[in-house]
Curated annotation (Swiss-Prot):
Comp. bias intervals (Gly residues): 12-22
Residue ranges: DNA binding: 218-281
UniProt gene name: OSH71
Annotated protein name in UniProt: Homeobox protein knotted-1-like 10
Organism: Oryza sativa subsp. indica (Rice)
Single GO term (MF): DNA-binding transcription factor activity, RNA polymerase II-specific
Length: 311
């Protein structure tokens, strides 16, 4: 609690003669601030230590010190774990039990400046505690609301409230607990049945709209990029048949079964892929020319992107 004793270094020393002597010595030290920097003499250091001890004694002996200590502990308890909270409460009880004494500042009115400081600092700590507590309260309220919404969506019961009138019943209501449980079960069953009927009714009423939305979504999806898995399967086939990347109709059927695409999408993908990333080698061109010029009698047909070449 050292920070509670050093919070007001400017407190005036009212009361006993010892305090006045210490204050005069401290003022003498403050008055010599313009002297060249050098280590203070031992007497000045002792006087400053005595002044600090006197300030601590005045704060600890003030009638408002228990309130100041309680406000400080309340600030430290915000967000603290249970074991730390218990320890802080014990410290607070000890401080309230041992606070107050026959020191120089033991009565209100002897030192108005100290009285004003103690009152002001208590108010500051109380406002600070409110600011610290507000985020925790907002977070707890948000979590409670989310829990209630999830429970309502899942068909479960809402979280229990803290209302003591609802949680605690009288002895006259105890004999009827079985009837109350049966009534609650019946109400819960009827509410679930009503929810199921409502879902069925909405599904029947809007099933056509849902089907149209699904078909429109699939159309838009087809117009966009192909799925990643489908493109991977097509690229695997492309890399395997890179020398002649012209899938047959059987290949297209197999690829359609693997990717879930229709043959038109597969055909368009291969056309675009060949235009962008494939160019036949010189040997392939020579073989194609031989097939065109000398292979007409065999009845074969060569397929290209722009059409067909054959008999």
């Amino acid at each position: 609690m050292e920070d509670l004793y050093s919070i007001h270094p400017g407190i005036s020393r009212g009361g006993g003669g010892g305090g006045g002597g210490a204050a005069s010595e401290a003022s003498g030290v403050a008055g010599g601030g313009s002297s060249p920097p050098h280590p203070p003499p031992p007497a000045t250091t002792a006087a400053a230590a005595d002044l600090t001890e006197l300030m601590k004694a005045q704060i600890a002996g003030h009638p408002s010190y228990p309130s100041l200590l309680s406000a400080y502990i309340e600030c430290r308890k915000v967000g603290a774990p249970p074991e730390v909270t218990t320890l802080l409460e014990e410290i607070g009880r000890e401080g309230r039990g041992g606070g107050g004494g026959a020191t120089a500042g033991g009565e209100i009115g002897l030192d108005p400046e100290l009285d004003e400081f103690m009152e002001t600092y208590c108010r500051v700590l109380e406002r600070y505690k409110e600011e610290l507590t507000r985020p925790f309260d907002e977070a707890a309220s948000f979590l409670t609301g989310i829990h209630t919404q999830l429970a309502s969506l899942c068909g479960g019961a809402p979280p229990p409230t803290d209302n003591s009138d609802e949680m605690v019943g009288s002895s006259e209501d105890e004999p009827c607990s079985g009837d109350a449980d049966a009534a609650d079960f019946g109400q819960e069953h009827s509410s679930r049945l009503a929810d199921h009927e409502l879902k069925e009714m909405l599904l029947k009423k809007y099933s056509g709209c849902l089907s149209r939305l699904r078909s429109e979504f699939l159309k838009k999806r087809k117009k966009g990029k192909l799925p990643k898995d489908a493109r991977s399967a097509l690229m695997d086939w492309w890399n395997t048949h890179y020398r002649w990347p012209y899938p047959t109709e059987e290949d297209k059927v197999r690829l359609a079964a693997m990717t879930g695409l229709d043959p038109k999408q597969i055909n368009n993908w291969f056309i675009n892929q060949r235009k962008r990333h494939w160019k036949p080698s010189e040997d392939m061109r020579f073989a194609l020319m031989e097939g065109v010029t000398g292979g007409s009698s065999s009845g074969t047909t060569l397929y290209f992107d722009t059409g067909t070449i054959g008999p």
